[in-house]
Each structure stands twice: as C-alpha cells, then as structure tokens.
Amino acid sequence: MAKVQGKGAAEKENDDGLREKMIAVNRVSKVVKGGRTMSFAALTVVGDGDGRIGMGKGKAREVPVSVQKAMEQARRGMFKVALKNGTLHHTVVGKHGASTVLISPAAEGTGVIAGGPMRAIFEVMGVRNVVAKSLGSSNPYNMVRATLNGLRASLTPSEVAAKRGKTVEEILG
C-alpha cells in the first residue's frame, strides 16, 4: 500500500529554483531463494513554479536514495505547460490506465481544488487557480501520469489557430 503524502507533503526548494514534492513511497519486496529482499519505490514531481513540470520514480534499498533517484529522473523529464494568469487556457481530460482526470481553468481567487497527487503537481508547477476531478482509479502513479498527459494536451489559442489555419481573433470570437 502506498504511503501517499497529503497536505504536509515534503516540499523543498533547491538552489536551482526548482520545487520538489514527494507524492508516495511504497515498500516493495522481491522474493529470492534466501527470502525476501525489501526495497522502496518513490514517486516525486519537480516544477519551477512557472509552468515546467516533471515526474520521476526511483527504487532503492533505502528511502532517501530512492527519493533522490526519483528527483533526478523528474528533473531530466521536465516539460513546459502554457499557463494564463496562473491557470490553464481550457479544460482538458487526461487518461492513463484506469485513471481519468478532468482539469478545468478557474477564476482568480478560486485556489487549487484538486485531490491527492494532482494538488502536488499544480503546486510545484505554479498553478494558482484550477479545478480538477479524478475519475476511476486513485492509484497515485496512474493519477500523476493521467494529469501530466492532460497537461501535455493543453494548447494555447495561438496553437489552436495555427492548427485550424485561422487567426487568434477568429478562435477567441
């Protein structure tokens, strides 16, 4: 069973300006001839507070080492999400496995209305106003992947206009 971090999730800000958050730590075991070998699997997210986000998972015999591996992987896999005044441009749906997440932009002052791992993602990437709903599986790994898939699918009005061969004014009405 994963130990999911709630409101008191371990968040650190490094000297490189990146925010790190640990989402879950799982104790896993491998059965070998001499018995069981215990190790720990960690799931983390890293963001810059300005729309860049990355997810990492690491596994090691000790918790700190697995968390460090996960943070390094998250830093290597960061990508940029276009934000508009601390929220998204439009509603997106993300899916991974049995998890589906619905992420909607929100008006200024709404705050981050999201549960579990989704809240950690929005906090480290600098989203201030968003409403997100998790549907299906609540497995932390699947929820994080579904959220990131949804964020990757979000487009700016200029990207939508370029895709349709129109101007931004025509798209926005």
Curated annotation (Swiss-Prot):
It comes from the Bacteria. This is Small ribosomal subunit protein uS5. SUPFAM superfamilies: dsRNA-binding domain-like (SSF54768), Ribosomal protein S5 domain 2-like (SSF54211). The N-terminal domain interacts with the head of the 30S subunit; the C-terminal domain interacts with the body and contacts protein S4. The interaction surface between S4 and S5 is involved in control of translational fidelity. Residues 18-81 form the S5 DRBM domain. Pfam families: Ribosomal_S5, Ribosomal_S5_C. It comes from Bordetella petrii (strain ATCC BAA-461 / DSM 12804 / CCUG 43448). Belongs to the universal ribosomal protein uS5 family. HAMAP family: Ribosomal_uS5_B. Gene3D superfamilies: 3.30.160.20, 3.30.230.10. With S4 and S12 plays an important role in translational accuracy. Located at the back of the 30S subunit body where it stabilizes the conformation of the head with respect to the body. The keyword Hydrolase does not apply. The gene is rpsE. GO terms for cellular component: small ribosomal subunit. One of its GO terms (molecular function) is structural constituent of ribosome. Keywords: Ribonucleoprotein, Ribosomal protein, RNA-binding, rRNA-binding. Part of the 30S ribosomal subunit. Contacts proteins S4 and S8. GO terms for biological process: translation. InterPro entries: Ribosomal_Su5_D2-typ_SF, Ribosomal_uS5, Ribosomal_uS5_bac-type, Ribosomal_uS5_C, Ribosomal_uS5_N, Ribosomal_uS5_N_CS, Ribsml_uS5_D2-typ_fold_subgr.
